[in-house]
Every structure is written in C-alpha cells, then in structure tokens.
Swiss-Prot record:
Keywords: Cell shape, Cell wall biogenesis/degradation, Isomerase, Peptidoglycan synthesis. Substrate binds at D19, S20, Y51, G52, N84, T85, T199, H200. Pathway: Cell wall biogenesis; peptidoglycan biosynthesis. GO terms for molecular function: glutamate racemase activity. This is Glutamate racemase. It comes from Agrobacterium fabrum (strain C58 / ATCC 33970). Transmembrane segments: none annotated. It comes from the Bacteria. It catalyses: L-glutamate = D-glutamate. Provides the (R)-glutamate required for cell wall biosynthesis. The lineage of its organism: Bacteria, Pseudomonadati, Pseudomonadota, Alphaproteobacteria, Hyphomicrobiales. The keyword Cell wall biogenesis/degradation applies. The active site is at C83, C198. Its EC number is 5.1.1.3.
Amino acid sequence: MLKTSEAAADVLKPVLVFDSGIGGLTVLREARVLMPERGFIYVADDAGFPYGGWEEEALKTRILSLFETLLQDYSPEVCIIACNTAFTLAGADLRARFPDMTFVGTVPAIKPAAERTRSGLVSVLATPGTVKRAYTRDLIQSFATQCHVRLVGSENLARMAESWIRGEPVSDEAVLAEIEPCFIDSDGKRTDIVVLACTHYPFMANVFRRLAPWPVDWLDPAEAIARRARHLVPLPQDAEHPDGFDFAVFTSGKPDFATRRLMQGFGLSVSSN
C-alpha cells in the first residue's frame, strides 16, 4: 500500500472515497465500474461514527482536519464525499480550504425524485443531521416546491445498516419502525418515491422493499455520484490499473474481523496506517 509521495511519478493518482463508516462502499462499487483504470482509497471515519449526533462545528472541524492529512498523504485525483451528512455540512468549507482539489459531493436526490414522482408525495430518509441542514431545505425550495416532501431523520438506521452489512441480525420490527414514517396515504394519493439520503441505506434496500406497506421507488444516488466523478476525472490513453492502491483506511486504526472481511469482498486490503 503506497502513499502517493512514495509512488512513481507516472502512476495515475487514486480516487479517494470518504464516508463516516462503510456505507460509502455503495458509491465505491459504482465508481469502480466507471473508472477501472484508477486505484481507490476508501477512508472510513469509524472513530467518529455515527455523524448524526455530532455538534455541527465540532464535526466540521474534524472533517477539515482529517482532509488536511488525507490530501497530504495520498494526493488523490478527486475526492468523493460519499456521506450526505459530511458534504451538506462541510462541502463548501472543503472546497474553500483546498481549492486545488476536486470534491464530488453527495446530497439528497431531491431533484430527480421531484422529476419522477407521479403522486407528488416524496419522502427523504436520512440522518437527523442531513434532515435539519439548510442545504437540504434549499434543495426542496429549488427543485420540489410542487411536491409534498416529508423529511424523515432516523437516529438508528445507519447503525442498523452497519450491523446488517457485517452479517449481524437486525429485526424486521426495528427496521420497519425507522422507515414507516416515510409512507403517507392521503386524499387517495400515496408516497411513491423514497430518497435514500444516506449511503448506508442502499445496502438494506431489499429489506426496505420487503417491509414497505406498498411498493415505492427507493432512489439510490450512488450511480449518479459515480458518473459525476467519471466526468471530472481524466482518462489517459492506454491507462492501466496501478498497483499499490485499492485499500481502506479506518480512522480508529482497528477495524474488526468482520469489517476486514467485508473490505476484502470489495477488493480492498486494510491499511495499517
């Protein structure tokens, strides 16, 4: 595993994918399909997980400090912030602090939801931090004023998703309690789209579908985020996938066995850094 400063000068710079935990793997999976020539570094701030309960200024300071180190160590081509909470809070500050770096953000997919809905009833399933952020409400004001948008902030679902991804049991009753507020049945109309505004949630989409009181479109933004990154990352002629990258970094420095095994399933070794 290489830091960019240790790599040969002609090696393609890696793509850095950042999340509070392991939910950003949904974005990594799509990005790899579109950028096979690039190495990937997945950074999980598991020492700070979950982000939903943090005070805003403290979390913003933490994220900016982490990126001071990450950009110095790995000099990526682009950084994908695969976390709605992190980007809606600190995205503008990251771009201002590091103007030479390209950041691709993750925001609630409210615009495509508003374009697709037939009933006009859309729900946004997110963390409490994303729900209360002015950024989210600005998206609604800009793109969805013709819809009724319900914001559902789940305190527990990101943790449940982390457990579920690792193969640990999560009860149907507990999951249903988190997603049930998304479903509105009013005046002969029903919610027909639920925006998954946390990158952890798509891992549980099949569980959501099974438990939902009626079928809806569960909108996963991962592919759109990956397409945006592909658009911004140059594709050199005769590019070959570099050796030494494709690893995960955990800010705790101590991912458990189940997490290491999960990373291997995504083709990532775990950095000892």
